[in-house]
């Protein structure tokens, strides 16, 4: 199930550079991480955040084609297409891609297994980790990558017993940091470097990445985009890579400023014969990187794909990110060498032009090979590397270096007519005579990327740039970014690490400082973020202050942000703040060290790659923790404030003669804004007004920060004892027929309990993550319980509770700091069927009891505030008004509106509905669902039976929950729009300066458990259709056939078959619509399978151009309906099974996946979910036949009378424009524009 984070009012994060050991620290582990988004170090600070972060889960959600996004978080799609749909990740960010509305909440999977754990709120950070400024072209099947950031909680304050002398301290601090003890580095004679790291997770698999140190920054004026083109052609043209697909391997590629990376995630051995796959994987990488075939047919195919990609990714987010980068790096080529390239140049290149660029840059000495995984015999691995690569362009046969002519591509026109060899050297081209020239030793560039920066340093004389303004009709919110650019501080000694720690402590405080300003009913800003980041891609460290706000509040928002920055800079952090954050940081570091053997190989690999790019010392988790402990003992409050103040000087001292000048100030603003009572009016803003607002904020009077009392516990022991005496918690019988108070399944290790107040308990003890646990409360009901007079009440109510963040007598700040101290991440969410509350916690220092205390307080002593209700209402009003400015959301909105017969429960509430809501009505809508037998709590982690059952009895058993629920009786009928209707096919037009197009095709499907609309039980249909065959069966029916009939009667039959079917349809869509017909760059099929509601639907999402989009829609329909004429074959089914089973096997090593499997195990509203669904999942996949898939296919409504389609077209002459008045209801709004480079990476080709 997809997690769709609430818009950015709750967005906040603090992640610090550089993370010196791979893995995901606890406080960030549950934060959704875009795959491959930013392999860099970051200290990010965002505000305002909530202790209870709210996430609404919508029916219309983004595509889920991605791998696991967080350590301990299950893949959002067991069944997205795996090894077959390979391609390039081009110019969209993986993180931002989640914001593209699709119409499927679930990707194909038999059992839902994520309800948002991957989006949990970090108690310290306040929200998700922001990764920025990453122009990154990437490859086909999105990789699972390491977070380049530290969590916002990590280090502990330890004081030395005896004082250390100054000289002794200096000697220690200048000592080099230790290097990773298991990391093996080497270099072949031809210059190819390699790194090998044995790693146990995932078992029996390894990562092989070939990094070529060439990217868009190395392109000449007439080559813009050619590195990305080579990535496409070389990767997708490799026959050896294709042969690996049948082994269960997945592959990918990406390009960005400074490098191109090809990578393969492979089993260690073939399943059938146990053959070692490392030689084949290395051979494929060798072919891809150094021996590609630049055939005309492949070049033309990829040219079409990239041109389609370029138009598709040209969203307003992309254009904003380009503006930010262009102003930040205006003095060098980073401002104009975006990986996707220029359309007019992409049209022109012939194979020879592309081949010459490849010859210039793709050679072994300019590449690094990374091997991480279950590589037990390192000497043998080195021999395999030597055998494959040693003879690839060895030094003695190296081609002469191509010398770039000062005239670039025009050199041949100006060069004199000289003999071939000399003329070629002048033009940079090879001639036959060149082969006789003594070869030149080719080495990689010493500085990557090879650019010069203008640094924002004190006393550096340069002219101040006036604020730049980017204004566009598709921008909804106001945002401003203030940038400071300095050289990267390479972390190689304890002194360097100490500086990082002090910056983290200092910047962590700013989040809470600004948070206190967020308590008013109408805050002037939407979010304020401070990001301090090392970027290997850009070769610099950038500090960014980002402020987003409603356009009418922009002046006040700027003033508040810069005022808080100046206050922190002038007064510094308090002793209490320093101690608090030091404690949290050291705890988090210790937790990470305990998880040293559970970090996925790809996380380790990407961490090493980024660290090497930044020239940071690479340590393992244990070394990182010990080093942090050592430097923590030496940190003083005075030094923390001195180091931190230097980071903020470009803001706090803005306008002073000796202050460091901002590298750029960029405001991104709308052209028109909505004014109550007036409507749309022009939005005017000038650079001098921005400057005046900054200066005005800095002149406001400042006061020091008072110390805040942080609770050590939310429920005292005496209070707990009183509760136990009053409510006498106990475990009750699980069955009315038998007196069974506990069920334990030996095969799965799952235990089931039920409390006397009706709350159901499921738990599983694992060692997947050392001394870490996860917990989820599921409450039945969700938005489906909203009636015609309370539309939006549940979603606004959940958001209101999150916005308040208070419990009992504890303020929101106290609750958040309680989470910080106990390493608790939590989130509050809702969807159409359920309300969720989720936790991730450490088990050290009673962390599990602290998490249970917080859950108890939310259930028993929740606080509903009028100002929080006002903020939540305003938030959804803003989202609604932003719909017409998004092509994808407008198109999806119109389709959903038609398909579900104007049912507002599946979309965002309209302004009319919001006006009807009151604080009491939303409170009632939410809390009426919190009744005992309607609540289920699941816990998974490295705890003991005694620990978990004690917490359950003490904190859940003492909840005074009512014992009966009538929620289901209040669910109004849900139906699809009947045929015929003009709304079965619609079009949306958006006015834009650039042309784009997209389309959604959708239709009814069953739910996960075999129920269709009107409550029809499809198992009865199957039984009745096979009744005649059963009557005529002989008594000697084959045992295998009998067993298969049992599979068809299994409660998960439709979940299994539909997920397999989705895999196959996805594959066919890609092969037909994208690859063969060239009508799209991106097409996907997804299923929305409900658990409780008796319906579901499928969605095909396709992007195209205005001239091709109608053909693309027809082609998609043809694929969808063509499964009868073009029958499924065993090869397709086997590949789909292998993909889903491999993902299932890998995910069972994570706590969050098990948390999802436990969901609804005792839910009365999901009666067909039982323990056999978990135990027999693998068997069900393996047993599925083609006939089974066609049984499921018959219940996907694909005929013309059942199918709905909506085409969206954007352009200057796109027709009648969609307006606010045409929207009866809305979908999730786009987050405020902000953050550098978030959408400029390349999209996946699959």
From Swiss-Prot:
Q: Which UniProt keywords apply?
A: Chloroplast, Hydrolase, Metal-binding, Metalloprotease, Plastid, Protease, Transit peptide, Zinc
SUPFAM superfamilies according to UniProt: LuxS/MPP-like metallohydrolase
Kindly list the places in or outside the cell where this protein is found, as annotated in its UniProt entry. Plastid, Chloroplast stroma
Q: Which GO molecular function annotations are given, in alphabetical order?
A: metal ion binding; metalloendopeptidase activity
Cofactor(s) listed: Zn(2+)
Cofactor binding annotation: Binds 1 zinc ion per subunit.
What are the annotated disulfide bridges? none
GO cellular component entries: chloroplast; chloroplast stroma
Domain of life according to the entry: Eukaryota
Read off the InterPro entries from this record: Metalloenz_LuxS/M16, Pept_M16_N, Peptidase_M16, Peptidase_M16_C
As for what it does, the entry says: Cleaves presequences (transit peptides) from chloroplastic protein precursors. Initially recognizes a precursor by binding to the C-terminus of its transit peptide and then removes the transit peptide in a single endoproteolytic step. In a next step, pursues the cleavage of transit peptide to a subfragment form.
Q: Matching PANTHER family, A to Z?
A: NARDILYSIN, STROMAL PROCESSING PEPTIDASE, CHLOROPLASTIC
Protein name per its UniProtKB record = Stromal processing peptidase, chloroplastic
Annotated source species: Oryza sativa subsp. indica
The organism's lineage is: Eukaryota, Viridiplantae, Streptophyta, Embryophyta, Tracheophyta
